[in-house]
């Protein structure tokens, strides 16, 4: 068999960025949700100061008295264009993409001074948050019955909800919070983050939850169902469902989590959790190991691709002989790709779709290989999925390279980060929590609602 790498030996790789002004974020065709606590939000703040200093502060990028949103859209693009007329940006090349409102390296340096350029991880985070759309400071999203019309959330006299509970797309999460989509169900990431933050700053967590503090303490210990068993009498599902169907309690939890998203202590716990060996660390190494067995070295685009799949899907398939054979056979057929790494990403996307959100997963995956294929090479299904979801791409919009190798970081074990949540083995529920969740929510319909004619 001809080695896979040899098949690509005569094929030019993805074009390296020109020697001109390199792109950091290009939001000219679609807004980028980088996050209100990201380095890009700090850029917005500094850009507003730069504009104010040269008399071009209106319309504002960041209105007076407000915090930056981290959403890179029209206001930021127009702010960059106006700033090009300021003395502080006189060294930005005249032919720079910045003339269209693109955030480039020369614009960053002019506005941010000695602040380092955004890292590959920070750019990947911005792309992933643009997909997830669950920023710090936002209310959490409930995943119960999420595929149907949920009415007023009131059970009927017979104990069933006043709507049909459809949940095909995300039956095991129950509740989602924060930019990496932390859940209270299968992953228990919400429990981990709150427990870590509570032990570091008890008063902050206790103040946020108020009268729900006792419930929060029970929440840490309640049994979950794992990734496979998401229906029926699962204690943590009973607990969260009872909150979801009780408007005052629901608001208390939503307000608490939204408030805590503004806490530096909580955000640090969140970041440390995901960076740990128990979460991203081992999975990133597993993806890199798969690439190594295929004779590939992960690039910047690969790193973002891995991190996105970890967020939305999980670990890669097991590296058995069948998987490796299928990947190699697929890559050999991808002769229109200008990069073997892009071919591998497309092949993995096809080999390992999402169990319940296949179209969304495909749409996200396409954003990591779209730029490596000529027009007409991808299927109509791929293009429509990408264009109909969040049409961003790692190379075009985030300036990531499919040539530059990416470093897979060493990760610390969770045990090194402090207090570990208690064992989730409790079934302690109040009588109202046991009665408060309709059977139709505990046992949802695992399909999407029929289309309305």
Language-model features: locations:
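Sec-dependent N-terminal signal peptides
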Residues: 1-4
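Cell-envelope/ECM-targeting effectors and their regulatory/trafficking segments
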Residues: 6-452
């Amino acid at each position: 068999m001809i080695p896979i790498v040899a098949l690509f030996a005569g094929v030019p790789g993805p074009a390296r960025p020109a020697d001109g002004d390199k792109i950091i974020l290009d939001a000219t065709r679609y807004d980028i949700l980088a996050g209100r606590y990201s380095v890009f939000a700090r850029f917005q703040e500094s850009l507003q100061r730069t504009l104010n200093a040269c008399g071009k502060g209106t319309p504002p990028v960041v209105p007076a008295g407000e915090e930056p949103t981290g959403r890179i859209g029209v206001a930021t693009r127009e702010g960059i264009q106006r700033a090009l007329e300021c003395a502080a940006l006189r060294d930005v090349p005249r032919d720079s993409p910045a003339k269209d409102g693109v955030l480039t390296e020369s614009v960053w340096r002019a506005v941010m001074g000695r602040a380092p350029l955004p890292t590959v991880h920070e750019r990947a985070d911005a792309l992933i948050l643009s997909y997830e759309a669950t920023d710090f400071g936002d209310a959490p999203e409930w995943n119960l019955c999420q595929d149907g019309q949920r009415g007023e959330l009131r059970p009927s006299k017979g104990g069933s909800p006043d709507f049909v509970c459809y949940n095909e797309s995300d039956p095991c999460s129950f509740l989602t919070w924060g930019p990496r989509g932390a859940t209270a169900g299968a992953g228990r990431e919400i429990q981990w983050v709150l427990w870590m933050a509570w032990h570091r700053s008890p008063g902050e967590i206790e103040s946020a939850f108020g009268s729900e503090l006792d419930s929060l303490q029970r929440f840490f210990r309640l049994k979950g169902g794992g990734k496979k068993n998401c229906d029926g009498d699962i204690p943590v599902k009973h607990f969260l469902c009872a909150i979801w169907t009780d408007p005052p309690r629901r608001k208390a939890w939503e307000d608490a989590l939204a408030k805590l998203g503004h806490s530096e202590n909580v955000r640090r716990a969140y970041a440390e959790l995901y960076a740990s060996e128990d979460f991203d660390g081992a999975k990133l190494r597993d993806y890199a190991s798969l690439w190594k067995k295929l004779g590939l070295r992960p690039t910047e685009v690969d790193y973002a691709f891995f991190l996105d799949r970890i967020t939305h899907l999980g670990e890669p398939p097991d590296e058995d002989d069948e998987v490796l054979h299928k990947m190699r056979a697929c890559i050999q057929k991808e002769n229109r790709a200008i990069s073997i790494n892009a071919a591998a990403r497309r092949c993995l996307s096809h080999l390992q779709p999402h169990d319940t959100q296949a179209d969304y997963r495909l749409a996200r995956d396409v954003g990591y290989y779209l730029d490596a294929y000529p027009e007409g090479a991808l299927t109509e299904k791929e293009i429509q999925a990408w264009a109909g979801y969040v049409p961003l791409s790692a190379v075009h919009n985030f300036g990531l390279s499919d040539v530059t190798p990416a470093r897979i970081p060493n990760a610390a074990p969770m045990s090194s980060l402090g207090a570990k949540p208690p064992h989730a083995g409790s079934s302690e529920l109040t009588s109202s929590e046991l009665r408060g969740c309709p059977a139709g929510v505990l046992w949802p319909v695992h399909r999407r609602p029929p289309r309305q004619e």
